[in-house]
Amino acid sequence: MIAEQGDLIEVCFDPTVGHEPRKRRPALVVSDGFFNNVLSSLTVVCPITSTSNGHPLHVEVAPGNAVEGCVCLEALRAIDLEDPHRGARHLGASLDEATMGRVLDGIGAIFGI
C-alpha cells in the first residue's frame, strides 16, 4: 500500500497493551510520503476514535471528511501497512488541510519542535 501524509486509512491496531487504542479502526497517516514509500517499510499513523472527550491531544475531525471522530495524537504509532494481519486499506480520501495542520502542530508540540 502506498500511503501519503493526510491519507485516511482503516487498519487493525491489535495487538496492543495497556491504554493503546485497539481493534480495527480508522487512522490518519502522519508521516511524509517519502518516508513511507522510500525510506522505511513503516508508516506513522494516529488512530481515530469515535469518542469526543475533550482530551487536549485529540484533534476533532472537521465535518465533511470521510470519517468522524478525533485524531488521537498521544497514540502516534509506526506500523507496517504491508503486514496482512493489519488488513490496511485506503478509505479513498485525505483529511482536509485545516485539520491536518492542527494535527501536525500538535505532533510538533509533543516533540517540542
Region annotations inferred by a language model:
Residues M1-I113:
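Conserved functional hotspots at enzyme active or ligand-binding sites that engage polyanionic ligands
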